[in-house]
Amino acid sequence: MAAMKRLLASSLLILLSGCSLMQPPIESAETIQGTTTVDAVEGDKSESNSGLTDALRNRTDPVAGDPAWAPIHPKGKPEHYAAETGSLFNLASSSSMYDDSKPRGVGDIITVTLNESTKAAKSADADLNKKNDASMDPLAVGGKDLTIGDYNFSYALKNDNKFSGSAAANQSNSMSGSITVEVIEVLANGNLVIRGEKWLTLNTGDEYIRLSGTIRPDDIDFDNTIASNRISNARIQYSGTGTNQDMQEPGFLARFFNVSL
């Protein structure tokens, strides 16, 4: 009997010690994203600095798969089971007849129509003209000119300065196309923070478009598109990498002489 009591006591101690070692469940976020950097249009330029090549080009190319631009993956919400009532109506899957399918949550997708066009012109003209004349008649004493040798006391000065200059500058830019981005954050006022990129691989290099900004759900059209001029704090980057991009830029010697001269 005593041995049985000792066995029960030891079993109880082992059970209590095992319960104390159990860790509480770890709460995971509803959204898994590759980065916490929200506003980073440039992102990480390259995986590793290529040294002399980047120094001579004075440019570091971005790379595809940048963690700052990684897509986010919302986790599935747990299902809530309700007692069966025999009704065919399911409140969880119901929607209002006045509601639409606009993106309103993290991970939703929206297409941005790029239609950017800017034009600036400036001209300036300047004309300056300054003219001075000064003279003095010969001094006369007793009706005769006062002289020293062959020179009298008189002078005549004239000064004429002119300056003329003109300058003109014209610049225009345009961009058209589309890019599909994701909602990465929902602000307290209901506005949506969007971010996304598109990479096109060519024979001798890559081209990419990156876009981020803040939009209003009311500005989204019925076909789930929004114009780029409706984006607040928009950052749009369109460029390329590789040989074609290198050929469009002057070399480091040309840049050096352009600056020094």
Swiss-Prot record:
Disordered: region residues: 37-67
One GO term (biological process): bacterial-type flagellum-dependent cell motility
PROSITE patterns hit by this protein: PROKAR_LIPOPROTEIN (PS51257)
Gene transcribed to yield this protein: flgH
Name of the protein described by the UniProt record: Flagellar L-ring protein
Keyword Membrane listed: yes
Homology family: Belongs to the FlgH family.
NCBIfam families according to UniProt: PRK00249.1-2
Principal localisation: membrane
GO MF: cytoskeletal motor activity
Lipidation, S-diacylglycerol cysteine type: C19
One cellular component term from this protein's GO annotations in UniProt: cell outer membrane
Species this chain originates from: Vibrio cholerae serotype O1 (strain ATCC 39541 / Classical Ogawa 395 / O395)
Highest taxon above the source species: Bacteria
Record text on subunit structure and interactions: The basal body constitutes a major portion of the flagellar organelle and consists of four rings (L,P,S, and M) mounted on a central rod.
Membrane topology: Lipid-anchor
Lipid-conjugated positions (N-palmitoyl cysteine): C19
Pfam families, A to Z: FlgH
Position of the signal peptide: 1-18
UniProt-annotated location(s): Cell outer membrane; Bacterial flagellum basal body
Keywords on record: Bacterial flagellum, Cell outer membrane, Lipoprotein, Membrane, Palmitate, Signal
Role of this protein: Assembles around the rod to form the L-ring and probably protects the motor/basal body from shearing forces during rotation.
